[in-house]
Regions:
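C-terminal substrate-recognition/cap domain of FAD-linked oxidoreductases
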Residues: 2-179, 183, 187
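Activity-critical C-terminal alpha-helical subdomain
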Residues: 198-253
Length: 253
């Protein structure tokens, strides 16, 4: 995390793709991409399982610019005692990253449910959010939870929480899903990054923003659609009943 922050705040340019995985996801990716069974495993000597973090990145653009970004990443990586795995893992990830979602429906047939929840954090509270949300995710026995950031900025980044659980009913799935969204709001993270806030996430939005800020949306809605005819019950929960809203932080009521 600290290395990623330093790279994004270096003012030397940004990688076009940038991803940092937590230890649980790192161990899974190194197995999925056959690093543990390839000659690259010798580069991992001294790195303990569940205590290592995988960083992937690309640079694009002018040759000089890309070279400068690469030099900065290499310098910061050395500072934090990282070790290069060549470009093999990046290429494996790039060519296989869209394959996993196709397994979702098949897994559901066997009672295995998986989903991705994302949030937005500042660098200053990233470690806290990661720890608190993962603690809630793992409170359910026999749960796989992987986490990574994949959209980084000088001010912060997103966090993806991907869980895999055994769940036979929609009610059970929604109950677990709700506990994670509760944890995200309590931790101080924004309830979404770029996936947006639809019907499922809407109850948590006002509790994150606060009534005054969220009230601006009500003013616009009342001006343009005072009868609430457009997309009722959807979008960001402007027509939610008070009892259905989630206010879980002491500093926002």
């Amino acid at each position: 995390m600290n290395a990623a922050r330093e790279i994004m705040q270096s003012e030397d340019g940004y990688p076009s793709a940038f991803r940092v995985s937590d230890p649980e996801e790192t161990d899974m990716m190194l197995k999925l991409y056959n690093v543990d069974d390839s000659p690259l495993r010798y580069f991992l000597a001294g790195f303990e399982p569940m205590k290592r973090s995988l960083m992937l990145g690309f640079t694009e653009g002018d040759k000089g610019y890309s070279k400068n970004v690469r030099k900065t990443i290499a310098r910061v990586a050395r500072k934090y005692h990282a070790r290069s795995l060549t470009g093999l893992v990046c290429k494996s990830w790039e060519h296989g990253r869209f394959n996993d979602p196709y397994l979702r429906d098949t897994l559901l047939d066997f009672g295995i449910a998986t989903d991705t929840l994302e949030c937005t954090v500042n660098w200053s509270n990233m470690a806290q959010v990661h720890e608190e949300v993962r603690k809630i995710c793992h409170a359910r026995p026999n749960t796989v939870v992987t986490t990574h950031l994949s959209h980084a900025y000088p001010q912060g980044a997103n966090l993806y929480f991907i869980f895999i659980i055994h769940s036979e009913t929609c009610e059970d799935f929604k109950k677990y899903h709700t506990t994670i969204l509760d944890a995200i709001q309590k931790s101080g993270a924004a309830i979404s990054h770029h996936h947006g806030v639809g019907k499922m996430f809407a109850p948590w939005l006002e509790g994150y923003m606060g009534r005054k800020k969220f009230g601006i949306y009500h003013v616009l809605k009342d001006y343009f659609d005072k009868d609430y005819l457009m997309n009722p019950g959807e979008t960001i929960g402007l027509d939610l009943e008070e009892k259905d809203k989630k206010f879980l932080r002491d500093d926002i009521k």
